Amino acid sequence: MNDPNWERSVLERVALAAVTEQRRARRWQIFFRFVWLSLIAVLVFSSLFGTKPEHLASSINGHTALIRLEGAISSENQTADYLIEGLDSAYQDSNTKGIIIQANSPGGSPVLSGRVFDEIRRQRQKHPEIPVHVVVEEVCASGCYYIASAADKIFVDKASIIGSIGVLSDGFGFTEAMAKLGVERRLQTAGNNKALGDPFSPSKESDQQWRQQLLNGIHNQFIQAVKQGRGQRLRNDPDLFSGLVWLGEQSIPLGLADGYGSVQSVARDVIKAEEVVDFSPRGDLADRFAKRFGVEFSSGVHSYLNQLFSPQLR
């Protein structure tokens, strides 16, 4: 304390520290404002332009509308909604001469598959002048084929995988594992069959028979839809509805497909409108953001329960 100016020195250091802290806080404030403004700008831009398909920039000449069917057919993927939305957009465009559904899916929900099947049939009846064809890429099996059978024609590559007209419901039983671990299952129900399919309770023959009856019912709906869509083109083969899959080159003589073709060749040679315009809805950034942090949060548990209890066309 020999320095007579020590008080002034301390005050200067305190003031300097305060100014430094204020500058640091201001920089962070500016940073977060920039982040929020950028996010808002992206969301607004995406909402205005993100969902608009390529047809808005297409020429006035006639074109072939393309709609993509990719991945598992499920509510999480919004497969049915996107397909139906794409169909509506394609039909509403006065320049659409024909529609191609580019299929690459292993199947999925029988409910959603049937919903899209019915919508394609409805739109075909409403717009008979606009054909709807399916072009199979790698695979179009089970629920995907359910949908494809509603089209005017199905085109494949010789190495495509097609078919699997069947229904599957799988799961696991944990009763023996629970017994070894000393875990006791305590389950109360109101209704004698409320616990049907419970993986933690012993499986009963009556439960299996009931589940098989449900699967047979869905399978029969699938078969009738394929027969309705394909008609006399189907070959009378006992294995046709057994759940087997075939190569593209095998599917044509069986009547499951009509010929070979790609998106480009079908647009050019069948629809006669070589320009292909993608009408596949993508969803804007806001939709994807909400889906990622909303629906996807519970999709793991939901998918697991579906595997245990819900039949799948695959």
Q: What residues fall within each predicted segment?
A:
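Extracytoplasmic ligand-binding site segments that recognize negatively charged/polar headgroups
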Residues: 164
